[in-house]
Amino acid sequence: MVVPYKDQSKSKKEQVANMFNTISPQYDFLNHLLSGGIDIIWRKKAIKLLQNKGIKTMLDIATGTGDFAIEALKINPEKIVGVDISEGMLSFGQEKIKKMGLEKTIQLQKGDSEKLPFSDNSFDAVIVSFGVRNFENLQKGLSDMFRVTKPGGYCLVLEFSNPRTFPMKQLY
């Protein structure tokens, strides 16, 4: 298991929440900078895959500051719920959503990817961008994603892999 801080006695989940609480004020800038903007491009492409699928309800897991949820509005769902374990990230996300006047469509709440606080078959689509690497138990997180997805619904995961070749390996 990869943990943010190897010398701590806290669980990976607690370490991840603490790390994101700490970096939340700079997260959007750092994410776009360190990914070379690829995060923005991938989110746009991913949401295009969900066009014309009749999606009315969406869940954005590890929503952070809400970038993927905001991008998902392009397919006109009635409701998007974003969950994250970091109160700091949620606070910045709420602020961003309020400034954009989107609080009627996007709702953010604290939530654990492995114990999602929703009934089975609740959402037409469940999305996560650059968050599964932070799941404490990947199998539990993915299983819970599928649990809350309606039959015939969609699960969409965006994630980076570890680069294996020069020069990206050295930069990563």
Predicted segments — roles?
Residues F130-G131:
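Short catalytic micro-motifs in class I SAM-dependent methyltransferases
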Residues E114-A125:
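A short acidic, Gly/Pro-enriched loop at the edge of an enzyme's catalytic core
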Residues Y27, V126-I127:
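Hydrophobic beta-strand segment of the Class I
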